[in-house]
Regions:
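N-terminal Lys/Arg-rich, disordered targeting/topogenic segments
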Residues: 1-13
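Hydrophobic membrane-insertion alpha-helices, especially the h-region
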Residues: 19-34
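Histidine-centered active-site loop/cap adjacent to the catalytic His
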Residues: 30, 330-359
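Generic structural signal for small/hydrophobic residues in well-ordered secondary structure
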Residues: 32, 108, 147, 163, ...
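Membrane/wall-proximal cationic-aromatic binding patches
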Residues: 40-128, 318-333
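Conserved SGNH/GDSL esterase-like catalytic core that processes O-acyl groups on lipids
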Residues: 104, 112-205, 209, 213-214
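Serine-dependent acyl-ester chemistry module
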Residues: 168-301, 309, 314-324
Length: 359
């Protein structure tokens, strides 16, 4: 005789879920061991790959930079490596000094000149073009907030005739962060009266062991996770030690208000301020990414002009130069930053905008 529905045995759903999870874990475990057997050396060592990557970055940065209470970090005075010289005052070398009021250049790694030698940076090439001393105050990894603060810190010291503030769109996003690549930084909050500085004095860099998330502490030991993320080109996010304090998009408002501080610096110092937009090389590879980067860039340049600052966008010049030479804009980069030719083009644009002699 058939039993009523209420009396029929129900499937053991929790048990089935546990069996599926157990099978999944066993499968992942087999894949992990198989991958470690393939690479062999990792069969006997089980490092936390995230911690190792962050430790290497921290140790490398300790040699190249020193802590700064206002900016987070600045180049270490006197540091030298093949093709790279940091002067006694913490600026990258641009060559022999020349008399007269200098030009001050501030920015991120594109201004500093990552991936090229001292004479190939655009500040050094600007000095060669104009015959005017150009001070390279660029610093790798800076956000637009740090770039502006750097300009405010250096202008009273060097009393430049002009200040060139260069940026890429990602520098705008960086203003939304409190920590980038393991290093704490100053940032700004927004209130009804404008910008409010936060995280100042900036705390020293934290021990990388203290900033790992639960997932990084747990799955950071997995070679399988590391391998998969490497194939997906997602290791930067997995390894990266970043701390966000503002919702995505807030940086555009912050950066716009920061151009007001640059306008005040222009008034107080008497130095003409020129904003220069450069571009991440990925812009030339992905149209959707390019559209967003250009939108952010054009918005910030519009803010600069509204505050009475001169501003130039290098996008069209990079495109036109490449077409003229029968190449692509990507040819003006090493890997992630401008090469010698790309920096020469930027230097020429700056010289022309400042109404200085250009080749």
């Amino acid at each position: 005789m058939n039993k009523p529905d209420a009396q029929r045995p129900r499937p053991e759903l929790p048990r089935r879920i546990l069996l599926v999870l157990a099978a999944l874990l066993v499968s992942l475990g087999v894949l992990e061991l198989g991958l470690r057997t393939w690479f062999w050396g990792y069969l006997f060592t089980w490092p936390n790959f995230v911690l190792d990557a962050r430790t290497v970055l921290t140790e490398g940065d300790a040699g190249r930079y020193v802590h700064d209470d206002r900016l987070g970090y600045v180049p270490r005075a006197g540091y030298a490596a093949p093709g790279l010289t940091i002067e006694a005052d913490g600026r990258r070398s641009t060559g022999a000094q020349t008399p007269g009021a200098p030009i001050l250049a501030v920015g991120d790694s594109f201004t500093f000149g990552a991936e090229v030698n001292d004479p190939q940076t655009w500040p050094a090439q600007l000095q060669k073009i104009t015959g005017r001393q150009v001070l390279n105050g660029g610093v790798n990894g800076y956000g637009f907030d740090q770039i502006v603060l750097r300009a405010e810190a250096l202008a009273p010291i060097y009393k430049p005739a002009a200040i060139v503030v260069a940026f890429i769109a990602d520098d705008i996003r960086r203003t939304e962060m409190r920590r980038l690549w393991g290093a704490d930084k100053p940032y700004f909050d927004l209130d009804k009266n404008g910008l409010v500085p936060r995280n100042v004095p900036v705390p020293p860099r934290a021990d990388p062991r203290t900033t790992l998330t639960f997932w990084q502490r747990t799955f950071g030991y997995s070679l399988l996770v590391d391998f998969v993320l490497r194939q997906l080109d997602q290791l930067n996010e997995w390894y990266g030690d970043h701390l966000r304090v503002h919702p995505e998009g807030t940086g555009e408002r912050i950066a716009c208000l920061l151009t007001g501080r640059l306008a005040e610096l222009q008034r107080s110092s008497g130095a003409r301020v020129l904003m220069v937009a450069e571009y991440d090389p990925v812009v030339w590879d992905h149209p959707k990414f390019a559209a967003e980067q250009r939108r952010m860039t054009e918005g910030l340049l519009a803010c600069a002009r509204a505050h009475g600052l001169a501003a130039i966008d290098s996008f069209d010049a990079l495109t036109a130069h490449s077409a003229k030479e029968g190449g692509k804009p990507r040819d003006l980069y090493v890997r992630w930053h401008m090469n010698d030719a790309g920096n020469r083009l930027i230097a020429g644009l700056v010289a022309k905008a400042l109404a200085l002699k250009a080749d």
